[in-house]
Amino acid sequence: MLNNSPRRDHRGLCICEEDQMWSYEILGTDIYHLLAAFVLYSVLGWALESTYMSFCNRKFTNRGFGKGPFCPIYGFGGVLGYLILSPLRDKLVELYFLGAILATAFEYLVGVGMIRFLGELWWDYNNKPFNYRGIICLESTVAWGFYAIGIVQFVHDAMYHIIDKVQLQIGTHLIQGILLLVAIDYTVQLIRVFDIDVRSKGEALKERCQALIARW
């Protein structure tokens, strides 16, 4: 016998058909909350890092790849970190060390990818002790462990509390609008970066050709 009762979210509220795509779950959490948390972590991470670097440089420093206040590294890191580490909520020692290791590995992979595809790195640990290629260092690894505890124990629950205060339809529109703006922003920046790279390689090739011609 078919179950015709309406689907409900984690708060027991009915979900209309057009909103059901947002209720599909990944590792026990619906897509709506995952994307909303991703956006909030990305904005919060950008704000914290830009504030810190602006203080260090004594001038405003945008730590995002695009023009807007968005840093997806923190979005992915925060969401994935919580999904993986939340089972260790009551085991602080294991939570700290696993969080430190996973975050350091994630930071290294992101750094290598940026150097490979963008030709630049958004951070530089070369002046830090016990660093590796300027991408990771002991100081950041120690800090990542405490960040992991903070996210799992406090930040994520508070974030979900804020998300739940926003009406679902309004929240989905906000998420879609923000991600669309970010996609446009990042597309423009990628075009600019790769255009500069292509032009620089073209100029280098032109100089080599001119040098060969001059020899003849």
Give the positions of each predicted feature.
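Aromatic-rich, lipid-facing transmembrane alpha helices and their immediate juxtamembrane interface loops
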Residues: 16-216
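Positively charged N-terminal leader segments that act as targeting/secretion signals
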Residues: 1-18
